[in-house]
Amino acid sequence: MRLFCCCLGLVMMSPLSVLGQQAPAKPGDAAPPATPLPTGPPLSDDDKANQLSDQVGKLMVKCVNLLTAQDPLSLDYCKQQRDLADQYPPHMRMLDKMMAHDEYGIALAAFDHKQEALEEFDREVALVPKAVKPGSAEWSTAYWHRAMIYTQMGQMDKADRDYRAAEENFRKPAPTAESASIDRKRRTILRQHAALLEKEGKPEAAHQLLQEASK
């Protein structure tokens, strides 16, 4: 399931500080439950993963579309996506699992559920070494999103640590050719970290990051 690469571009580049200003979800809002997997003889791990992948992909599209539209229903669809992705057999579709936690974390942050969002980003970061290669954009994105939620929560030391982890990863050789969108993301991370350092009274360190972002 690689559809997320195009669908999530806009959402992943949106600052969580902006998303977090949306209206809280209404108590009665709920998405219909996900379709249960068909019953029958036990499935092989591959067959189970393939069946789950189809549902996870459909929920991902709904999750991202509703989140982009700032619709509170995104919380339910993103949660269903996360819950189904967690049912993949161990060590299979790790990137799908990782992205499901990321998207649900973004949805929670969008509607001001900061602590719950942090828990999702914690789970995402824990999956990173199993799901993606060093130097990949997804590796940096996981730390970047957690850095932003730490910033919202006023935990600046932890935010600084995660920004550094995201930047350090981007300085490693990329496993695939770097696209313009990935380069924009790298620059965004550097500039956000520079802004944090400036507020923390570290202008020289902030200036170094801004210089790197300009390259």
Go through the PLM ranges and name each one.
Residues G20-K79:
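N-terminal leader/linker segments that initiate helical-solenoid repeat arrays
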Residues S44-N50, D83-L95, L127-G135, R171-I182:
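Flexible helix-coil transition and linker loops at the boundaries of alpha-helical arrays
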Residues T68-A69, F111, M153, E200:
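Structural motif corresponding to the intra-repeat A-B loop/turn of tetratricopeptide repeats
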